[in-house]
Amino acid sequence: FTVIYYVFACRPKWENFACANLLDRMQEVFPYRKAPRFTPERVWELGVSYLKRLLVPWHGKPMFIAGIDTKLSHLQAGHMGAKMSPDEMRALMKDPEYNTFGFNRVIFEIGWAGQGFLSVRLMMKDAIAHHDDETLQMLIGIQERWAEKQQENGMILPHFERYDDYDPAKIAKAALCQGYAPETCNLGWGASEMAKIYALLRDNGIEKPEFLRFSTRICDFFCAHYSPETGFGKLWSMEGEALETTGSVGGFIINGLLDTWRVTRREEYLATAAKALDFYFERDVNHFVCTAGAIDCVAVDKETSFPFVISSLDLFEITKEEKYLVY
């Protein structure tokens, strides 16, 4: 076989970001030649079809389960830090019980990997477009159940199923991704998507003030608890106490602030979002540091770049300040 190596030399456009030059050059060396297989309309149709499969009953009412996986992936994800030998892995992969896709994990999650709120919003758009009031009311019911769980201080468990066995003592023993305590990734997604859901329904003649209140409670909490040293932190207790403050995952709160600002026009949300974005860029992103979007580990993580890219573009659109394009 043949191995080809490429050496790339450049003067970086920005300190610590020579990769930006490299990505531009790669488009010339390795042009993308594949055309889309499906039209956008067909992709949407298939996506909605998949989302409908994720609706499962929970205590007699529909909820969006996080996704379809295999027992093998559940075994890996459920045992953080556990080691599995290659032979053990191969044996399990041959076992249909462990290698068949299905609903092997009961997870009803606000955002992050589960994206329950985003799934609801997309299906709402489809239901409205097709005048499907029955489906729309069912989806509104899902969000009503979530809104009922939120506390006055804005805190909510990121996994709905954890309300069945919630015990504060489990927080110290569980991985952060297991939904026993509020964290800034899911809270940011929650504020953002619920504000969008509120606006979508309002624009179609349906008023759900409790949905907007869901978002403003989260935004009010983080405006009050922003820190110039740790930003929005990572993990919080249901009582509103900071449990873990490391990493860049607090950036997801910026998206929540901006999307809620678009609906409320509360200047505090916009000002706090801009202040926080500057903080995370100066402390983390400008140094090519972007950690803990995965919430359950301190990792260099592409997922955490999402809120900084999106919120920079949003703030440029809102303020027209060129620095956000540089960001």
Task: Tell where the protein language model's regions lie, with residue ranges.
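Well-ordered alpha-helical segments within folded domains of soluble proteins
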Residues: I107-I128, Q178-A199, G240-R262, C297-E317, ...
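Alpha-helical solenoid scaffolds that mediate protein-protein interactions
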Residues: D126, L139-A147, I197, S215, ...
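Non-catalytic carbohydrate-binding regions of carbohydrate-active enzymes
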Residues: A224-H225, T264, A276-A299, I318-T319, ...
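Carbohydrate-recognition beta-sandwich/jelly-roll modules
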Residues: F1-W189, K196-F211, D220
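A short secondary-structure junction motif
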Residues: L54-W58, W146-K149, N153, F222-G233, ...
